[in-house]
Amino acid sequence: MHPAHEGLSAMPFYDDFDLSTVDVLLISQYVYAHLACHGSWGSAHHWSRTMSAQRALAVQRLVYHYEWNIICILPLDFDDVPFPGAHQCIYHFGPFFLTPFLVVSPSNMLTSGSFHVDHAASLPYVLAKTNFKGRVFMTHPTKAIYKWLIQDSVRVGNMSSNSETKIQMYTEADHLNTYPMIESIDFYTTHTVSGVRITPYPAGHVLGAAMFLMEIAGLKILFTGDYSREDDRHLVSASVPPGVKIDVLITESTFGISMHTPRVEREAQLMKAITDVLNRGGRALLPVFALGRAQELLLILDEYWSKHPEVQKIPIYYNSSLARKCMQVYQTYVSAMNDNIKRLFAERMAEAEAAGDTGRRGAWDFKFVRSLKSLERFDDLGGCVMLASPGMMQSGTSRELLERWAPDPRNGVIITGYSVEGTMAKQIVHEPDQIPAIMTRASNAARRPGQRENEQTMIPRRCTVQEYSFAAHVDGKENMEFVQEVAAPVVVSSAPLHTHDEDARTNGVIDSGSR
């Protein structure tokens, strides 16, 4: 046992709870069954000497199955506490219920590892609707994008949910009113709250994503959250905190033991798939999340177009009003990105100055990508490449284009990220003969004479479908290498019940427990 465990009783919040009243095995099983998310709850008392090995392992499993790193979760209330679902954009704010064990102590601190909704979307609820009185930390880019992303999610949820089934967990006003409570912090800076020290380190994954090193009474715990170690065009990849002996490592295992195709090979396959569609006169649809991998894909496409004059007359469109707002954040935080994007930024500046054009010299000022404000302004004639959100194609622009383009065999859909079960993105990968029409215009066009009003309208699917993963998560090999580099005596890994790779569920993962 780590000697720091003995020091926990001296912590200011230690007397606020009684572990003997908590059935952590039941809690762990409930979380596994009901929460499809992949952040982390952390608590000083999880490592208490009062726990048996079995109970400690159960809590270790619990630690990695909620949306933030939170210090000191108190089992004081057994009423149902509703929290937003992990993927609200898909489920239209349908809630999961954490039952029956949580209220949050006023002495807590809260950190968000990234701006993605499955890590941050419950934050306005916690700040506006619970008794949480602690401090909240995000990196500067995470906080900047979080503001726009959650605001957009609330608006989309309000528009897409009918009044009979809608359960609104919080309002846009709740989000904006609690936003000033969030403190922006820099990577590599240490912050102390109630004797707990936290230090954020780059996690790769998306702009601003952070791993958090926590020190509790001398015990050092590293939460990776979602992280990536692959060299790409703009992110600083995750690395082991230098000069720190980690006692407990809590890491994601999104892809289990499966391994990514090498990056160069994946990019070549992606570009061949796109150009094959274009060469037959078709349109290539890439459904994407508005922020995250979409920016990496735009860099890949813009670079390829700049090197291949034969495709430069074919337009690349990016349709996302949210992304247009947030691209200024990407421009602002180029200094927080890797050397590849910094070099591109310097080259663009030099080119612009040489041409006397001071208006287009940012690394994110694309040469061949056009921002599309709405489909009303889209001249749908001839071949093109279209990156459109949402990534799951449950509704919105990507779904409307899918329904419009699916009947034409010249067109192609290319999936570039993970696909959630039950969504159109997951269904289309299996190449169904037909897809349901849910968008008004496509539905009306496909309606048969004499079809009943409530009868489901189906659209033939003749377009090609291909899938190439560019999800910014470590694969099994990268994760294992990171675990070995950290060399922590205790390693806790997310279980296969939540993984973006369905094959990993059957292939197995690094499981929770001690090395």
Regions flagged by a language model, labelled:
Residues 1-111, 116-120, 124-296, 300-315, ...:
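His/Asp/Glu-rich metal-coordinating catalytic cores
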Residues 3-10, 42-44, 51, 56, ...:
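Amphipathic alpha-helical heptad-repeat segments
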Residues 33-34, 98-99, 488-490, 497-500:
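Conserved tryptophan-centered aromatic signature that marks the ligand-binding surface of SH3
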Residues 90, 222-224, 230, 252-261, ...:
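Acidic/glycine-enriched edge-of-secondary-structure segments
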